[in-house]
From Swiss-Prot:
Protein name: Histone H4-like protein type G
Keywords: Chromosome, DNA-binding, Nucleosome core, Nucleus
Organism: Homo sapiens
The protein's assembly and partners: The nucleosome is a histone octamer containing two molecules each of H2A, H2B, H3 and H4 assembled in one H3-H4 heterotetramer and two H2A-H2B heterodimers. The octamer wraps approximately 147 bp of DNA.
Gene Ontology cellular component annotations, sorted alphabetically: nucleosome; nucleus
An MF annotation (GO) of this entry: protein heterodimerization activity
Length: 98
């Protein structure tokens, strides 16, 4: 039975993970079924196969803009946490009020 001092690492104090998931291709998480479901909700009947990649590209650009403006808003307010209201203000500024 070992006694750990203050410098020892107990449970939940692990170091860096060796096998970390690569975050380079997260846009593929927007699946074909998800895009189809959104299109059906919007009233689309048939979907061309090339639409899925284009939709992912457009969605990525849209999110980059929203996140960039939300971070700028947060930095201007001298905060470090992007709040939901910051995102709401950005969408309102773009004319997409929630």
């Amino acid at each position: 039975m070992s006694v750990r001092g203050k410098a020892g690492k107990g449970l939940g104090k692990g170091g860096a993970k060796c096998h970390r998931k690569v975050l380079s291709d997260n846009i593929q998480g927007i699946t074909k079924c998800t895009i189809r479901r959104l299109a059906r909700h919007g009233g689309v009947k048939r979907i061309l196969g090339l639409i899925y990649e284009e939709t992912r590209r457009v969605f990525k650009v849209f999110l980059e803009n929203v996140i960039w403006y939300a971070v700028t808003n947060t930095e201007h307010a001298k905060r470090k946490t992007v709040t939901a209201m910051a995102v709401v203000y950005v969408l309102k500024r773009q004319g997409r009020t929630l």
